[in-house]
From Swiss-Prot:
It comes from Moorella thermoacetica (strain ATCC 39073 / JCM 9320). Belongs to the TRAFAC class OBG-HflX-like GTPase superfamily. OBG GTPase family. HAMAP family: GTPase_Obg. The lineage of its organism: Bacteria, Bacillati, Bacillota, Clostridia, Moorellales. GO terms for molecular function: GTP binding; GTPase activity; magnesium ion binding. This is GTPase Obg. It holds the Pfam family GTP1_OBG. An essential GTPase which binds GTP, GDP and possibly (p)ppGpp with moderate affinity, with high nucleotide exchange rates and a fairly low GTP hydrolysis rate. Plays a role in control of the cell cycle, stress response, ribosome biogenesis and in those bacteria that undergo differentiation, in morphogenesis control. GO terms for cellular component: cytoplasm.
């Protein structure tokens, strides 16, 4: 079975916790704090692998979590950082954020990697909080939570040429004729249910990859037939070979040509402008010459028409050499990845906002959420330090302006607190 789409959940490993520890050795008075830092959590990384063809590995498992970092130890020993979790995907996978739809990466080269969920940094041990006024801090930090998100993986085959046309036009027969691929071939529509790839090698040494796409019908861009599911696989192709069945009446052949091109334009207008060559197939059946003359009269000089027979091989070599020459003049396809935005150093902190759901006030700010998540809430000194931070950050003032009163519930990230007004 061919699986070209998957939805998965990924989570980077949490950082290891820093610990509270003090040096205790004979003859070493006031040894001081020596709690070590936690290790960094592992990241989840997608890596393109040319040896894979589908996303079937993600069919039976949807959740992937990297390991957390090791906790710190006494004697200033830092915890071990966790290994990254590497998930291998086929070359040609587009990675999107499932919530926003934003393109995160387009993996078009073997070995190309992208971090999709970064691991959290390790929490600092109490030795890192020594100051001139606090020589023996009794608090440390928890590890930073790893990033988590849902992803949509979408495989778009990497091929130079796409064979398009109505069902039963002879696309699979042509692919079998020009390459070593052996797609299923039968005399009924929709024999091809999955895209097939074949490598064409010419006598002059040139070669290119051809994709046979399941037949398109009217309404394919809206989900009719199998078209919508597989139209994505011709988005990367540089040349389209439109296979027409000349055993049909001339007007039907022309109507089929228009139907397929209309579907391409509706799905992606750029596809309709892509270089397209017409392969008038089944010339071994009587009456084909009249159909070719009819097509040339109606299509004019806009499209190069090659009379061929995929069954006998007639005219196929001339078609292939023309396609090879056309490919030599075209640039490689651009990646789907959205252009990288210009990086600007932020001098001001990220905006702090308060959202209200009944008597629950939700504090929104990445820095604040991270600080709360990394605080030992059962440690009195750590909580006092957090309260000072929240006040300096303006959280108290923002809550008062939002109408928070004593007894209200304050939610910061995954934690909830009861609000108490200052006297």
């Amino acid at each position: 079975m061919f699986y070209d789409e998957a939805k998965i959940y990924v989570k980077g490993g949490d950082g290891g916790n820093g610990i509270v520890a003090f040096r205790r050795e004979k003859y070493v008075p006031r040894g001081g704090p020596n709690g070590g830092d936690g290790g960094r959590g592992g990241s989840v990384i997608l890596e393109a692998d040319a040896g894979l063809r589908t996303l079937v590995d993600f069919r039976y498992r949807a959740h992937y979590r990297a390991e957390r970092g090791q906790h710190g130890q006494g004697k200033n020993k830092h915890g071990r950082s966790a290994p990254d979790l590497i998930l291998r995907v086929p070359v040609g996978v587009v990675v999107r954020d499932a919530t926003s739809g934003q393109v995160l990466a387009d993996l078009v080269e073997d070995g190309q990697r992208v971090v999709v969920a970064a691991g959290g940094r390790g929490g600092r041990g109490n030795a890192r909080f020594v100051t001139s006024t606090d020589r023996a801090p009794t608090f440390a930090e928890k590890g930073e939570p790893g990033e988590e998100r849902w992803l949509v993986l979408e495989l778009k085959l990497l091929a130079d040429v796409g064979l398009i046309g109505l069902p039963n036009a002879g696309k699979s027969t042509l692919l079998a004729r020009i390459s070593a691929a052996r797609p299923k071939i039968a005399d009924y529509p929709f024999t091809t249910l999955t895209p097939n790839l074949g490598v064409v090698r010419l006598e002059d040494g040139d070669s290119f990859v051809v994709a046979d796409i399941p037949g398109l019908i009217a309404g394919a861009h809206q989900g009719a037939g199998l078209g919508l599911k597989f139209l994505r696989h011709i988005e990367r192709t540089r040349v389209l070979v439109h296979v027409l069945d000349t055993s049909q009446p001339g007007e039907d052949v022309l109507a089929g040509w228009r139907t397929v091109n209309d579907e391409l334009a509706h799905y992606n207008p750029e596809l309709a402008r892509r270089p397209q060559v017409v392969a008038a197939n089944k010339m071994d059946i009587p009456g084909g010459e009249e159909k070719v003359a009819f097509l040339r009269e109606r299509l004019g000089d806009s499209y190069r028409i090659f009379p061929i027979s995929a069954a006998t091989g007639e005219g196929v070599q001339e078609l292939l050499y023309h396609v090879s020459g056309l490919l030599a003049t075209l640039p490689p396809p651009a990646p789907v990845t959205a252009p990288e935005e210009e990086k600007v150093t932020a001098l001001a902190p990220e905006e702090l906002t308060i959202e209200r759901e009944g008597q629950v006030f939700i504090v929104k700010n990445p820095d604040v959420e991270r600080r709360v998540a990394m605080t030992y809430l059962d440690n009195e000194e750590a909580v006092r330090r957090l309260q000072v931070y929240l006040k300096q950050k303006g959280v108290d003032d923002a809550l008062r302006r939002a109408g928070a009163a004593t007894g209200a519930i304050i939610r910061i990230g995954k934690f909830e607190f009861e609000y108490v007004e200052e006297p």
